[in-house]
Design a protein with these regions (language model features):
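N-terminally biased helix-coil "hinge/interface" segments that flank
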Residues: 1-171
Length: 171
């Protein structure tokens, strides 16, 4: 767009109404299964996700922080399609639905950047090598959560400064 346009261009959306897909299941606030996840619903969701042509999926089901079995079942089915799947019950297992959903969407979006880098690093290294990334808590882990990895750079900087200071003191 021209630099002085009067019509704002907007930002790319991580989530659109068309990409929010329902699945028929229900878990109560106490974690009990009220409406089981049936295979027909699972197959329908797989087909809808495949038609969207996305690279990653965020799964956020009500009360999954108490009982994640439905999220885990959906993840297993969607991972078979070659997609990165972020589960709210793993990313941020708390009762607050908006925060849990937001963090899970960001995790899935971040995966489209971080997972290919991790795969490329592994492909370039000798067989049996591991890639570890510093997460927001300062711990280096392999198979990290993409969202925690994005916030890990500050923690990694502090850890590196601490290590350099320790090396300097040894001299």
């Amino acid at each position: 767009a021209p630099p002085y346009t009067l019509v704002p261009t907007g930002r790319p959306q991580l989530l659109t109404p068309q990409s929010c897909l329902p699945v028929f299941e229900r878990i109560a606030a106490d974690g009990s299964i009220v409406e089981p996840l049936i295979d027909e619903a699972l197959q329908s969701l797989r087909a809808q996700v495949q038609a969207l042509g996305v690279k990653s999926v965020a799964i956020t089901l009500l009360h999954s922080y108490r009982e994640p079995v439905h999220e885990q079942t959906l993840a297993a089915a969607l991972t078979e399609l070659g997609l990165w799947v972020s589960l709210s019950s793993e990313v941020l297992p708390i009762p607050r639905e908006f925060e849990r959903a937001s963090a899970t969407v960001l995790d899935a979006a971040a995966a489209t950047c971080t997972v290919p880098i991790e795969k490329a690093l592994l492909a370039a290294l000798p067989a049996g090598s591991r890639v570890r990334a510093v997460q927001s808590d300062g711990v280096a882990r392999s198979g990290t959560r993409p969202l925690r990895t994005l916030f890990g750079s500050q923690a990694a900087t502090l850890l590196a400064a601490q290590r350099v200071a320790a090396l300097h003191e040894q001299r």
